[in-house]
């Protein structure tokens, strides 16, 4: 393909500015749409199962309105010692989270679904990224929270911003997955949908 006229409509099923910015790296024309699904976890559902289910549900919700489009959807959840990590919402809760994570490792599970509504084919994967925090002082934590205010972010940090200063190590296949969209796997899936990348 060498013309946008030949490209199918590509829709990112997300309102996240971070996912939008990541997808823009691929230099493909796309639009965004809010999947507007219920993201409540099921009773006794594992984090991995939830992430996979929600990624698929987001894709299908948007696909219903766009019969010939390619839908990209993602969901992410972090775990610490096997338990889901929530959003702190307040400064005291964020301090508590970061104190708990000091010197420890948390896992980010990022689900990705590409649904080709032309063929009804689904491409799905789960990326796991391990983030190890350095030993954090009270000053480290206070200064970071005042500067970045990550109170709506699971784990009380923004890895795409100043949060990177809190880490000693990141282990994973794709650094973009930690921010919310695994671009390496996404590129592979789009190629299977006959989208040439790099696209000119």
From Swiss-Prot:
It is an enzyme of class 3 (hydrolase). The record marks 18, 76, 160 as: Important for substrate specificity. Its EC number is 3.6.1.-. Its cofactor is a divalent metal cation. It catalyses: N(7)-methyl-GTP + H2O = N(7)-methyl-GMP + diphosphate + H(+). InterPro entries: ITPase-like_fam, Maf-like. It is found in: Cytoplasm. Its main location: cytoplasm. It comes from the Bacteria. Keywords: Cytoplasm, Hydrolase, Nucleotide metabolism. The active site is at residue 75. GO terms for biological process: nucleotide metabolic process. GO terms for molecular function: nucleoside triphosphate diphosphatase activity. GO terms for cellular component: cytoplasm. Pfam families: Maf. The keyword RNA-binding does not apply. PANTHER family: 7-METHYL-GTP PYROPHOSPHATASE, BIFUNCTIONAL DTTP/UTP PYROPHOSPHATASE/METHYLTRANSFERASE PROTEIN-RELATED. Nucleoside triphosphate pyrophosphatase that hydrolyzes 7-methyl-GTP (m(7)GTP). May have a dual role in cell division arrest and in preventing the incorporation of modified nucleotides into cellular nucleic acids. Belongs to the Maf family. YceF subfamily. This is 7-methyl-GTP pyrophosphatase. It comes from Hydrogenovibrio crunogenus (strain DSM 25203 / XCL-2) (Thiomicrospira crunogena). The lineage of its organism: Bacteria, Pseudomonadati, Pseudomonadota, Gammaproteobacteria, Thiotrichales.
């Amino acid at each position: 393909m060498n013309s946008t006229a030949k490209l199918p409509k590509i829709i990112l099923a997300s309102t996240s500015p971070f996912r939008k910015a990541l997808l823009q790296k691929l230099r493909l024309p796309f639009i965004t749409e809010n999947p507007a699904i219920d993201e409540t976890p099921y009773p006794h559902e594992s984090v991995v199962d939830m992430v996979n289910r929600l990624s698929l549900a987001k894709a299908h919700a948007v696909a219903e309105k766009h019969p010939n489009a390619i839908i990209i959807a993602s969901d992410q959840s972090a775990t610490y010692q096997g338990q889901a990590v929530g959003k702190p919402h307040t400064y005291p809760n964020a301090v508590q989270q970061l104190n708990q994570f000091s010197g420890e490792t948390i896992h980010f599970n990022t689900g990705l679904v590409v649904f080709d509504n032309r063929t009804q084919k689904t491409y799905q994967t789960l990326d796991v990224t391990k983030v190890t925090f350095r030993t954090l002082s009270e000053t480290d934590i206070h200064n970071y929270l005042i500067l970045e205010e990550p109170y709506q972010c699971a784990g009380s940090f923004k890895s795409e911003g100043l949060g990177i200063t809190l880490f000693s190590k990141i282990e994973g296949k794709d650094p973009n997955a930690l921010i919310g969209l695994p671009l390496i796997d996404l590129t592979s899936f789009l190629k299977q949908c006959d989208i040439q990348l790099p696209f000119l």
